Amino acid sequence: MAYRTCAACNRQLSSDSYSRNQWSKGSGRSRCSGCVHGNTNVESIDPAQTARRNQSSRATFTHEALDNPFAAGSFRWVAKGKYTEGSRQGEACVCKWFKTGSVMEASFFATDLEASQKAVDLITKWNEERRIDRMVKVNLPEVWTFDSGSRWAGRKVLQEPFISNYQKFNSNTGWSDDSVPWARVMQALSHFTYHISGGRNVLCDLQGGIYRDGVVLTDPVVLSTSREFGPTDLGSEGISTFFAHHECNEFCSAQWRKPSNARSFYRPTAGTTMEHVTSQYSRPYMTAFSGYSVPYEDDDDDSYY
């Protein structure tokens, strides 16, 4: 991704922070979207403050936990384990693998990591706005491989810290739960990402845990006009569907852009919608993985932020 210093606020920002017109003016003349729209009172935040990382290089999972995942999304299984070294040693973690098995695995890993990094960039911009007095963070997963000698040696999973107090706030088809303040904040965040990206993206399918000092999200979907973020990226039709069902709330700004004549192309559902996926559905046992190291007897672990 290309970066450039804004001619007005002197911040080093990615191309997503500029409109196409401003970016075309070249270095030394381009002004970011925040400056163009009069929002210059923005304190820069390091993206590292937004990303919640493993901070470990090893974890362990029981065979029982892997053969009987404690959670499942629309297309992933989730098993709970524990970090065994690093600054998160002893803390709970999760590994995730795809229900389609190995058919689309490599492609899914790549787009998952790209979407997660894009989410970090977009959420960092939200945090810089200081529209609320809490931080929004997002788990940044890594692809880990199981040890040799284990039952599924060499198999790969997405590894990230465990999230407690889990709930879903919106989906990638316009569904949202506006019953609690944090859910309305998440709707505003989704709207903001469209504005700050110049109408190119909407961050949605927001889910995670509420903590004392903020929210931690996981598995976000990035909708893009270029449809570059995998099978959950429903493209321009997904973006239009979001706004067809979105009602601005107290956390939105009247200055944020919205598409004109938004139409709904999808039925709003709480689950994650995918398109154009070759499916070879697998039960947990068939795609489960052995521990990264010698499995331990799992207990009811506490979660950490």
Give residue spans per PLM region.
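Short metal-coordination and nucleic-acid-contact micro-motifs, chiefly zinc-binding Cys/His arrays
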Residues: 2, 28, 74
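Short cysteine-rich clusters marking metal-coordination/redox-active sites
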Residues: 6-9, 32-35
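ATP-binding glycine-rich phosphate-binding loop
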Residues: 41-90
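Acidic, Ser/Thr-interspersed intrinsically disordered low-complexity regions
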Residues: 294-305
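Cys/His-rich microdomains that often coordinate metals
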Residues: 13, 17, 39
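Catalytic activation segment of kinase domains across protein kinase-like and atypical kinase folds
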Residues: 159, 182-281
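Conserved structural core of kinase catalytic domains
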Residues: 89-183, 215-240, 244, 248-253
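Short linker/helix segments within small regulatory modules
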Residues: 18-30
